[in-house]
């Protein structure tokens, strides 16, 4: 018993193979063999089961019958589709035939377009025939252009001159007056606006643009005035000589005294006494050589000259004519006589206050 129990325990724990189990238990082997034999004999019985259950046979027969019917019906079904596509296309797709029918007349209408254009050209003069022609053009192909009469074009141009964009009530009114459709009036105004835009872009801007040739010429003239006319330079030098004689005497920084122009020498000579010789009439003043009137920054007369130069300018501006007063403030160039008179008066005023 213990041995058998141990073997059972070992069988449970070690899990031997099926062969060992069958050899160790002969009774089990016999039962296994008999059961396997019985099962082998029972494998073919499915047909007997169908015999025992007649409902299964009925289901199988019903399943087989529709299949046979389907197989039998597939033949005519496959044969029947060829006639089906022949009949349905006409009612199912009528729009395809309509498009073809419309395309054919459009091509035929496009061919006699020269004749239609000649007819329109002959009938342009009559305003009564105008509305009929656009209708023909609208009903035909789109390539045909609307032929407007002279009166229609005149009225449309007048309206475009006052209003480049039409509201719908006005458009309807014009269309009724000119015997045109509202769409024709709208399209004409659209085309006219585009034409006006092209004209304004390609013609007017080159003349008025800042980069245009005329604008460059206009801009170049004032730029050349300060360089060509010495009047502005002379007035600037004279003002500097009136208020800052020492700086005017030195001239621009780094420039040698010999490089100063005659106008600066005259203005500098006007601020210092004894540098110019007045002629009898007081019309001209000749500057002396540079060695004859040396300018020194450490001269004790410079502060007095500064003070009296400002006063002399004020007195001179009060005694001058109104034209000269205006010319001092304006960029208009002075004439040579005015400049000479101006320098001589400055020198005369400076000589009064040694």
Swiss-Prot record:
Phosphoserine is carried by which residues? 272
Compositional bias annotation for Polar residues: 52-71, 264-274
Bias class Low complexity marks the residues at 104-118
Q: Name one GO biological process term.
A: rhombomere 3 development
Q: Does the keyword Endoplasmic reticulum apply?
A: no
Does this entry carry the keyword Phosphoprotein? yes
Per the record, the domain of life is Eukaryota
**Places the protein is found:** Nucleus
Signal sequence, start to end? none
* Compositional bias annotation for Pro residues: 79-92
Question: A Gene Ontology MF term for this entry?
Answer: DNA-binding transcription activator activity, RNA polymerase II-specific
Region ranges (Disordered): 39-143, 193-231, 246-295
Question: Which GO cellular component does the record give, naming just one?
Answer: nucleoplasm
Question: From the UniProt annotation, which stretches of this protein bind DNA?
Answer: 141-200
Q: Where is this motif: Antp-type hexapeptide?
A: 92-97
Keywords (A to Z) from UniProt: Developmental protein, DNA-binding, Homeobox, Nucleus, Phosphoprotein, Transcription, Transcription regulation
Under Pfam families, the record lists: Homeodomain
InterPro entries named among the record's database cross-references? HD, HD_metazoa, Homeobox_Antennapedia_CS, Homeobox_CS, Homeodomain-like_sf
The family this protein is said to belong to: Belongs to the Antp homeobox family. Proboscipedia subfamily.
Outline the subunit composition.
Part of the nuclear protein complex gamma-globin promoter and enhancer binding factor (gamma-PE) composed at least by SATB1 and HOXB2. Interaction with IFI211/p205.
Functional summary from the UniProt entry: Sequence-specific transcription factor which is part of a developmental regulatory system that provides cells with specific positional identities on the anterior-posterior axis.
Could you tell me what this protein is called? Answer: Homeobox protein Hox-B2
Q: What gene makes this protein? A: Hoxb2
